[in-house]
């Protein structure tokens, strides 16, 4: 990679701004976040005009409704972005937090302390609200960010970033930057090891896989959400249906929506029809195996690869399983490691499921929609990690830090 590339220049400027950010007090960072929120409110007309151009272009290009919904900004959504920045300002600052501390036999005090990561690159698809969320979390945790949005949201991202940057002092303005250009620019960002400390991709499987396989910079993988709900033999059917409806239909285009329901054969006769009733009333098409179709002919046949789909739409896969072990095996084969749910009255089933399923979040008798930084009390999240290092699950402020060891003595030398 050429040392004179635009991405390298941006990363160097971001590093300089991050150095200033590291020294800011919490009150200073909180004031900046509030100012960025004001910038969004002041710039609402410009942001809406830019977003309208992006949406029109996307619609003309045949963008599907799920992506158009993610792309679209409204006055209410922009206000939500501003409120989100203010919410981050009210969160505890993890920087400087002592994780643990002890004294050596010679009296040296050792503390493990949270510090910013540095320069974080975020590559994401058609969601302009991610722009403000990412900038807010990075700034509060003392990091600079290089934001690589999709071309479909270019005008929106330009307007959002311009509105926020207009309220930042010059010495840290480059802590929030938009990375523009073609695919070669994305490749430069992914290979800018030594200039960019961390990459976080947010989007569909294609984007995430491309970043994970092509990056030389360390990556936190925010996986796709092929999430399951298991209705165990002891489940309260009404509870299970209510949870399934919420998890599927509240926002079908997000990663914590369920895509598949697995029903224990012992309860299928009483659970399948109420489930299909509730889903049909809300416009959901249920795709199932032969056994489920025999129980309710409204179910359409599932294609061979149906259970690997992250629909992000009003579609739901359904399968009858012999027992909980088969459900867990199905999840291991088809799941994405995001969020997995069981509805059951059995404590042993709860414990077996929680200890057997390999996922960032396991839910018992509650909706997968709770797997969210806001619901966890983290404030705005940078994404939901489905890997095991360096973070797993919703990533808030603490997940945007690393640690350093600070040793204090009074002249000790090692014997």
From Swiss-Prot:
Pfam families xrefs = Aldedh
Gene3D superfamilies the record matches: Aldehyde Dehydrogenase, Chain A, domain 1, Aldehyde Dehydrogenase, Chain A, domain 2
Q: Where in the cell is it found?
A: Cytoplasm
Any GO CC annotation of this UniProt entry: cytoplasm
Q: In which pathway does it act?
A: Amino-acid biosynthesis; L-proline biosynthesis; L-glutamate 5-semialdehyde from L-glutamate: step 2/2
InterPro entries named in the record:
Ald_DH/histidinol_DH, Ald_DH_C, Ald_DH_N, Aldehyde_DH_dom, G-glutamylP_reductase_CS, Glu-5-SA_DH, GPR_dom
One example of a Gene Ontology biological process annotation: L-proline biosynthetic process
| Uppermost EC category | oxidoreductase
What EC number(s) does this enzyme carry? 1.2.1.41
Alphabetically ordered keywords of this record: Amino-acid biosynthesis, Cytoplasm, NADP, Oxidoreductase, Proline biosynthesis
In alphabetical order, the GO MF annotations are: glutamate-5-semialdehyde dehydrogenase activity; NADP binding
**CDD domains the UniProt entry points to:** ALDH_F18-19_ProA-GPR
* Catalytic activity as recorded in UniProt: L-glutamate 5-semialdehyde + phosphate + NADP(+) = L-glutamyl 5-phosphate + NADPH + H(+)
The UniProt similarity line reads: Belongs to the gamma-glutamyl phosphate reductase family.
Q: Which NCBIfam families match?
A: PRK00197.1, proA
> What exactly does this protein do?
Catalyzes the NADPH-dependent reduction of L-glutamate 5-phosphate into L-glutamate 5-semialdehyde and phosphate. The product spontaneously undergoes cyclization to form 1-pyrroline-5-carboxylate.
Q: What is this protein called?
A: Gamma-glutamyl phosphate reductase
Q: Which gene encodes it?
A: proA
């Amino acid at each position: 990679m050429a040392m004179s590339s635009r991405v390298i220049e941006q990363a160097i400027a971001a590093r300089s701004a991050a150095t200033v950010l590291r020294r800011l007090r919490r009150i200073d960072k909180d004031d900046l976040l509030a100012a960025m929120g004001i910038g969004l409110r002041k710039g609402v007309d410009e942001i809406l005009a830019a977003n309208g151009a992006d949406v029109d272009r996307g619609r003309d290009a045949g963008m599907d409704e799920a992506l158009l919904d993610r792309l679209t900004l409204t006055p209410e959504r922009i206000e939500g972005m501003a409120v989100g920045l203010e919410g981050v300002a009210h969160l505890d600052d993890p920087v400087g937090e002592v994780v643990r501390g002890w004294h050596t036999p010679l009296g040296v005090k050792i503390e493990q302390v949270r510090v910013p990561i540095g320069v974080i690159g975020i590559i994401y698809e058609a969601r302009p609200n991610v722009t403000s969320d990412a900038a807010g979390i990075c700034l509060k945790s003392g990091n600079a960010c290089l934001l690589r949005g999709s071309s479909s949201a270019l005008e929106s991202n330009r307007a959002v970033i311009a509105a926020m940057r207009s309220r930042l002092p010059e010495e840290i303005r480059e802590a929030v930057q938009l990375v523009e250009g073609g695919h070669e620019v994305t490749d430069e960002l992914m290979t800018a090891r030594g200039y960019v400390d961390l990459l976080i991709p947010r989007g569909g499987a294609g984007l995430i896989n491309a970043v994970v396989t092509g990056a030389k910079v360390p990556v936190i993988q925010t996986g796709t959400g092929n999430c399951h709900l298991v209705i165990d033999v002891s489940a309260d059917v009404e509870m299970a249906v209510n949870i399934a409806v919420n998890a599927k239909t509240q926002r079908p285009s997000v990663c914590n929506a369920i895509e598949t329901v697995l029903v224990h054969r012992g309860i299928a006769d009483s659970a399948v029809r109420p489930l299909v009733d509730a889903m049909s009333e809300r416009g959901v098409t249920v795709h199932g195996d032969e056994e489920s179709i025999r129980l309710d002919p409204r179910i359409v046949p599932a294609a061979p690869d149906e259970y690997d789909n992250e629909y992000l739409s009003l579609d739901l896969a359904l399968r009858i399983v012999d027992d909980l072990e088969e459900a867990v095996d199905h999840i291991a084969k088809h799941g994405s490691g995001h969020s997995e749910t069981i509805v059951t009255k059995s404590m042993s089933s709860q414990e077996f499921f929680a200890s057997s399923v390999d996922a960032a979040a396991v839910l018992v008798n509650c909706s997968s929609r709770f797997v969210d930084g806001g619901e966890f009390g983290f404030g705005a999240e940078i994404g939901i990690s489905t890997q095991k290092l360096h973070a797993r699950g919703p990533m808030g402020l603490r997940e945007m830090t690393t640690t350093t060891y600070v040793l204090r003595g009074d002249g000790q030398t090692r014997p």
